[in-house]
Amino acid sequence: MARKENTFQSELIKEIKERFPGAIVLKNDSGYLQGIPDLTVLWKQYWALLECKRESKAVHQPNQDFYIDLADSMSFGRFIHPENKEDILNEMERSFKIRR
């Protein structure tokens, strides 16, 4: 059984802060801007938008794909769920370090 999205998100925030010391992780309000990804990660001069899903097959809400693609074209944007979490965080780590 898949974990609740908010449980996954809380654990993810802790892991991001461990992997990226000093990172600021902001929870975004989709009520303010429909489809904006759940999390903004700020670390040094880098940033990422991450949309948390409880599982890989979870439905994408309106505009989520647009904002993930836009963020990725500017910096880093991904859908993240328990099955791909390690791959995405590793990719984010590589992406941030490459741009130093």
Show which residues each predicted segment covers.
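Catalytic phosphate/metal-binding cores of nucleic-acid and nucleotide-processing enzymes, i.e., regions
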Residues: 1-100
